[in-house]
Amino acid sequence: MNEEVWAVVKYKPKEGCEPEFIDALSTLDMSHVVLNRYIKAYNGEIVQIVQSCNIDEVLAGQVAGLEWLDSVSHLLEHYGESRTDAISGVIIDDA
């Protein structure tokens, strides 16, 4: 499958843990994707925006990404049962 995939992942650092979490972002290897950017939202969340050429790129980083998330889990508030609030999908060419 050659469809371009975009993902948006939100993280909510616990109070007082934001600097450590932001430092930890630099240890996440995202060299397998086209674009990886972080923004700090006004509500305190850290938002990751990722562009991948295809689903194979997404899968290539999945294990390492989950291991990294495990390593920073203690720094994060949860979204219900989840450590992140994430969504992904493919580009709509005709829009």
Give short role names for the model-derived ranges.
Residues 10-23:
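Short, surface-exposed ligand-recognition loops at beta-strand->loop->(often short) alpha-helix junctions
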Residues 27-37, 51-86:
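An amphipathic, aromatic/His-enriched active-site/gating alpha helix that lines ligand/cofactor pockets
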Residues 85-95:
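Acidic/histidine-enriched, glycine/proline-rich intrinsically disordered or flexible terminal extensions
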